[in-house]
UniProtKB/Swiss-Prot annotation:
Regions that span the bilayer: 3-23, 302-322
Binding, heme: 461
Protein name: Cytochrome P450 2D7
Catalysed reactions, as listed in the record: an organic molecule + reduced [NADPH--hemoprotein reductase] + O2 = an alcohol + oxidized [NADPH--hemoprotein reductase] + H2O + H(+)
UniProt function note: May be responsible for the metabolism of many drugs and environmental chemicals that it oxidizes. It may be involved in the metabolism of codeine to morphine. However, another study could not confirm it.
InterPro entries found in the cross-reference section: Cyt_P450, Cyt_P450_CS, Cyt_P450_E_grp-I, Cyt_P450_E_grp-I_CYP2D-like, Cyt_P450_sf, Cytochrome_P450_fam2
Cytoplasmic topological domain residue ranges: 24-301
Membrane topology: Multi-pass membrane protein
UniProt tissue specificity: Expressed in brain cortex (at protein level).
């Protein structure tokens, strides 16, 4: 075929692609569609978004276009929701119409399919309801909200304190130990066992989980999801998600070993055994979501979502304690101290721990009601850390209206949770560490309506009760046994952040001195 023959063919292909592009963006011309930057042909707004720091990019776009603005990511229409009013209206008031998830073809390489979508990314329908109901009831049966699970967490907190004590007051980075402790709680729930902190397979699993979450952001990943044909190119999606793929392979080994110890005649000891029991009951039902492929996805969801978010929050908590010694210890800060000044802080974590719990008895969830200052500090750590700035994407299942704008069926929705947690109209000091956000004038704990670190609505994080328990028991146990400080002669760490899918504190070291 000569070049002369290729020219008409190229023109036909170009015209076809332009028509497809116009077909996907025609809704932008509809009345009351949210405003946004002008999309480029084919690419849409892919080049307008900094996927390495999406929250900052969205903040700039919000300043230009308002709380509800639109994007076109290749052929995918997207609406970004900012501020408490828009997020609550979409996720709560119109929750039934916004509870779906958009297609995610990139995850097919991980084994995602019609009957194996896990819980977090599952389409809104019978399979999601089945798995959500199963997860909630199983966690409750395993002791969530009861003394049995609380005992698992307090035992792990004791192991974590022992590992901190092994540092003998020397400077160290706490992140790795925090990851191990939180992951062991998830391992106990899902596999009925805990790992030693130096177990090679355990360390490998944690490394893969950390690297896998980093794959949740980036330009190429967004392109693969926005153009459905691209994930079918051999090895392309596998390369982008290679750490998540390796993580699931490692998880498969643990699940295979666990199956060998499962006795169907005995009550389930953990979530995996409860899932296998459901799978046996569902034999012969082709529509059931209880199958081997979905087991690995469900357990993987719990590991990835439950481990890194909680451990990152604890890492923020310890950093903020060494930067705000008055909040940690409840003492007057010397006039020359650069931390907060010369006032006596009304929030004193260790003083409250000593008054309510003492330094011998282990903390219990029952103590929380009598510890408003500590509870306020933990919530302010979540508020200030703002570790999940963007919620998991939603999709409209019918035409809806939000804040006066018309959003068509099939539109991807992104909730900018950071815009709610940093809303200057709601928070007195949104960009400063200020535990008083969660205390009233009488010193009682209060939770502002704009505190939404776990999102809101039908797809709000199902692990929120577990996360609250872990944060309170781990944080109080550590502050009960140790005083934390910057190592002598080292520069004071900063509040600076590393932004990816999660927002983590910049690497820092601390000293844990037994009290």
């Amino acid at each position: 075929m000569g070049l002369e023959a290729l020219v008409p063919l190229a023109m036909i292909v170009a015209i076809f692609l332009l028509l497809v592009d116009l077909m996907h963006r025609h809704q932008r011309w509809a009345a009351r569609y949210p405003p946004g930057p002008l999309p480029l042909p084919g690419l849409g707004n892919l080049l307008h978004v900094d996927f390495q720091n999406t929250p900052y990019c969205f903040d700039q776009l919000r300043r230009r276009f308002g709380d509800v603005f639109s994007l076109q990511l290749a052929w995918t229409p997207v609406v970004v929701l900012n501020g408490l009013a828009a997020v609550r209206e979409a996720m709560v008031t119109r929750g039934e119409d916004t509870a779906d998830r958009p297609p995610a073809p990139i995850y097919q390489v991980l084994g995602f399919g019609p009957r194996s979508q896990g819980v977090i990314l599952s389409r809104y329908g019978p399979a999601w309801r089945e798995q959500r109901r199963f997860s909630v009831s199983t966690l409750r049966n395993l002791g969530l909200g009861k003394k049995s699970l609380e005992q698992w967490v307090t035992e792990e907190a004791a192991c974590l304190c022992a590992a901190f004590a092994d540092q003998a007051g020397r400077p160290f980075r706490p992140n790795g130990l925090l990851d191990k402790a939180v992951s062991n709680v998830i391992a106990s729930l899902t596999c009925g066992r805990r790992f030693e902190y130096d177990d090679p397979r355990f360390l490998r699993l944690l490394d893969l989980a950390q690297e896998g979450l980093k794959e949740e952001s980036g330009f190429l990943r967004e392109v693969l999801n926005a153009v459905p044909v691209l994930p079918h190119i051999p090895a392309l999606a596998g390369k982008v998600l290679r750490f998540q793929k390796a993580f699931l392979t490692q998880l498969d080994e643990l699940l295979t070993e666990h199956r060998m110890t499962w006795d169907p005649a005995q009550p389930p000891r953990d979530l995996t055994e409860a899932f296998l029991a459901k799978k046996e009951k569902a034999k012969g039902s082709p529509e059931s979501s209880f199958n081997d492929e979905n087991l690995r996805i469900v357990v993987g969801n719990l590991f990835l979502a439950g481990m890194v978010t909680t451990s990152t929050t604890l890492a923020w908590g310890l950093l903020l304690m060494i930067l705000h010694l008055d909040v940690q210890r409840g003492r007057r800060v010397s006039p020359g101290c650069p931390i907060v000044g010369t006032h006596v802080c009304p929030v004193r974590v260790q003083q409250e721990i000593d008054d309510v719990i003492g330094q011998v008895r282990r903390p219990e969830m029952g103590d929380q009601a009598h510890m408003p200052c500590t509870t306020a500090v933990i919530h302010e750590v979540q508020h200030f850390g703002d570790i999940v700035p963007l919620g998991v994407t939603h999709m409209t299942s019918r035409d809806i209206e939000v804040q006066g704008f018309r959003i068509p069926k099939g539109t991807t929705l992104i909730t900018n949770l950071s815009s709610v947690l940093k809303d200057e109209a709601v928070w007195k000091k949104p960009f400063r560490f200020h535990p008083e956000h969660f205390l009233d004038a009488q010193g009682h704990f209060v939770k502002p309506e704009a505190f939404l670190p776990f999102s809101a609505g039908r797809r709000a994080c199902l692990g929120e009760p577990l996360a609250r328990m872990e944060l309170f028991l781990f944080f109080t146990s550590l502050l009960q046994h140790f005083s934390f400080s910057v190592a002598a002669g080292q520069p004071r760490p900063s509040h600076s952040r590393v932004v990816s899918f999660l927002v983590t504190p910049s690497p820092y070291e601390l000293c844990a001195v037994p009290r």
